[in-house]
């Protein structure tokens, strides 16, 4: 009959908006995603915010502390599920910078902080827009060896 199943399970309804970049926490407790008015590239949508639901019943989790009046978009979980890194244009509305926030055992986020740089002026001088942060447990270094992350 051309159908895949008899029921459709919906864990979140975006209410005439778009939900993009869904990522489940490593402990399978939460689903974090970006919600915007439309489309699938929310880094260009000022209204884009991070949203999260509990996967133990689909209840929304308060993410207000993560969001600003500008764009919050792509995000990544730490391997232990207690930290996230995400892209935001909250500082100037023009350039994307990475922010980090902690998620406690009760599902409450801490206030996000700007990803530290070896030279703090780098956050003001950088003219490129980085959109897709990923947390990794693998050692990284730049091709010219100007930075190394152990």
Predicted regions mapped to residue ranges:
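Sequence signature of WD/YWTD-type beta-propeller architectures
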Residues: 1-150
């Amino acid at each position: 009959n051309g159908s895949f199943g008899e029921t459709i399970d919906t864990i979140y309804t975006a209410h005439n908006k778009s939900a993009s970049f869904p990522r489940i926490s490593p402990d399978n407790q939460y689903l974090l995603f970006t919600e915007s008015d439309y489309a699938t590239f929310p880094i260009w949508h000022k209204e884009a915010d991070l949203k999260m639901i509990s996967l133990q019943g689909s209840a929304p989790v308060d993410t207000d502390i993560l969001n600003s009046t500008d764009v919050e978009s792509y995000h990544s979980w730490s391997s232990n599920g207690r930290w996230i890194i995400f892209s935001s244009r909250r500082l100037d509305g023009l350039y994307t910078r990475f922010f980090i926030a902690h998620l406690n055992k009760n599902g409450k986020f801490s206030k996000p902080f700007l990803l530290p740089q070896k030279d703090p002026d780098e956050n003001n001088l950088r003219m490129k827009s980085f959109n897709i942060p990923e947390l990794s447990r693998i050692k990284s270094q730049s091709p010219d060896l100007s930075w190394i992350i152990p």
